[in-house]
């Protein structure tokens, strides 16, 4: 089979360029100049080089840098007492001026030692260790008779907490009423717990209710939990919930795989 050929009108030549004249976007661009250039640089002329990587510069407000954390969609850091997300101060969020520890799960970032949560997608923040103090009345959540109570009622007691939170009571005059219990329901200004949790229906007490959070020196995310440690103690959250640290309960099958977890080790860490 014979294929057509093109006659060679010019001899084969070889050209070596030893002089780089930089970027020159003019019709008369000389030999050695570059008319079009992408990601190149003339900074090292007469040598040709690629440009350095681009960087973003954010304002720091002039304070001391206390922590930096990469989160989905941007960069979070603390300078002085101000929390920044992608260079914009988080309005109303004032932190302690000092080193920070960050960890994130499910779009919620936890910040220590302030014990604050922040959600970058919504721009919202709040206390990761909410607490309420005041006078409560112990009562039953149903109409059944009985001497023991399963709920506490007080104006505003429902605001800081969620159904399913494990909250710790302190201040009861009856010591056995103090402890950590899981909120089963919230009915207006009433927190409902398991039947017969508290000792006496009708009692009026001044107490404190807190959803506790450990004071971590180091934290990370692994296996759909946030893990934290300080000195000789390691904690992890309830599975999938970055705000539940002292939630210890088995499911209907007796499985505790979703519960929070903590352990004291023999030797403190550094």
Predicted regions and their residues:
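Recognizes the extracellular SEMA beta-propeller fold with strongest preference
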Residues: 1-270
């Amino acid at each position: 089979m014979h294929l057509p050929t093109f006659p060679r009108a010019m001899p084969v030549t070889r050209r070596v360029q030893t002089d780089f004249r930089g970027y020159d976007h003019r019709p008369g661009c000389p030999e050695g100049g570059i008319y079009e250039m992408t990601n190149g640089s003339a900074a090292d002329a007469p040598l040709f080089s690629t440009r350095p990587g681009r960087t973003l510069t954010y304002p720091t407000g002039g304070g001391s840098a206390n922590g930096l954390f990469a989160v989905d969609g941007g960069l979070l850091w603390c300078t002085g007492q101000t929390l920044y997300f992608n260079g914009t101060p988080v309005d109303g969020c004032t932190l302690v001026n000092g080193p920070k520890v960050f960890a994130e799960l499910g779009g919620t970032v936890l910040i220590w030692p302030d014990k604050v949560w922040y959600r970058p997608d919504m721009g919202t923040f709040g206390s990761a260790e909410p607490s309420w103090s005041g006078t409560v009345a112990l009562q039953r959540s149903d109409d059944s008779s009985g001497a023991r109570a399963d709920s506490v009622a007080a104006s505003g007691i429902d605001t800081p907490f969620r159904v399913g939170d494990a909250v710790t009571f302190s201040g009861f005059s009856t010591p056995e009423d103090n402890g950590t219990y899981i909120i089963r329901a919230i009915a207006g200004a009433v927190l409902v717990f398991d039947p017969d949790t508290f000792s006496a229906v009708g009692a009026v007490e001044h107490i404190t209710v807190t959803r506790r959070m450990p004071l971590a020196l180091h934290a990370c995310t692994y296996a759909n939990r946030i893990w934290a440690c300080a000195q000789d103690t390691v904690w992890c959250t309830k599975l999938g919930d970055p705000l539940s640290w002292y939630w210890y309960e088995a499911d209907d099958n007796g499985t505790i795989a979703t519960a929070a977890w903590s352990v004291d080790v023999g030797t403190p860490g550094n």
